[in-house]
Amino acid sequence: MRIKGLDGKEYNWNPSAVQAKAQSRSSLHLKAKELLDNLFPYDRILEEVSLVGSKTNRRKSILRADFFIPNRNLVVEVHGEQHYKFNNFFFKDKMSFYKAKARDSEKREWCELNDIQLIEFNYNEDIDEWRRKVE
């Protein structure tokens, strides 16, 4: 699959080959995985997929998507409270929080640039709201 990077270059992307090993997953992540498995029982659901071409001059690390469903050209992100509110558990300072918000924005930009649908599941929504976003 050809992908346009945030740097304007084109890349070959094989999402299956760029999955990270799932680390400890949050309860929200597990809940989202269960919902996606139920909604798309015959689709391959990839987790922690590297988004090629997402490095920038300001940020040298590559972005990752929580979930990617290739047959549906769909990225699903699970956003805990730390995506909306600063707290000392996740961030050492406010600058770290703002950098995380910038990464979320760059992920949206990457998906839009590549005509990939992005759905965000927010921590303060219930499972029915998540389901409605996907259906």
List the predicted regions and their residue ranges.
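Nucleic-acid endo/exonuclease domains
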Residues: 1-135
